[in-house]
Amino acid sequence: MIYLYAVLAGLSDVIAGWLALRGWAARIDARYIIGFAAGVMLAVSFLDILPEVNLKEDAAVLALGFLAFYVLEKVMMIHACGESECETHQIGPVAVVGMALDNFVDGAGMAVGYLIDPFLGLLITTAVILHEIPQGVTASLIMQAARWSPGRIMVALGVSGLLYPLGAMTAGFIPDAFHEKALAFIAGDFIYIGASDLLPEAHRKFNWKVILSVVSGMGFMEVLRFFVPLV
C-alpha cells in the first residue's frame, strides 16, 4: 500500500505541473490551495507526527529537519510562487534537483509513518500530496521561465516523481530504533514548509478567506482522523 501512496504523490507533482502548463496558475487564486495545504501540514506535524516522537531525545533531529529544508529552499530557490514571480528564477535544472531531493525525503517519511502505523502513513501522504500541488506548479513555472519545452518539463516532473517510491524503498533499510528520529526529521520538514513557506505565500495580502482555508486544512485532518479509523 505504501508504494501506491508514493505513486499517488508522484502523480500529484506531474498533474500540478501539467495544469500550470495549461495556464491554471494564471486563472486560479492559488492562495486558498496553499493555505489549505499549510493547515494540513501543520496539523499532521503537531497532532500526528510529534506525538509519536520522544522530543527529549529527538528535539535536535526535529531542528535539523527544519534547518535542512531551510537551507535546501534558500540554495535551490524552491518555494510556492506566482507566475510573475517565477519569471525571475532562471534555474530550471536546480529547481528539478531541489524538488527531487524533497520528494525523496517525503517518500521515506511516508513509508516510515506507514511502518509505525498505517493510518499515520495515510495522514502523512495526504499532507505530502496537498503540498505537492503548489510545489509542482512552482517547479513547472520555474522551468517555463528557463525556456524549457513542455515535453522536457513533463519528463523532469515525472523523473522527480519517481523519487517518492525510491525514498519509500529506502525506508525498509532504516532500523526500527531510528523510526522515531526519521519522523522527527520529517516533522521539522513539514513545520518549515507549512509555517515558513506556505503560510507567508498564502498571506501576501490579508484575506479572511485565506485564514479560513488554513483553518479548513487543519479541520479537514481532524475529520479524516475521526472518520477513517471507523471505516
Regions flagged by a language model, labelled:
Residues 1-231:
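Intrinsically disordered, metal-sensing/regulatory segments
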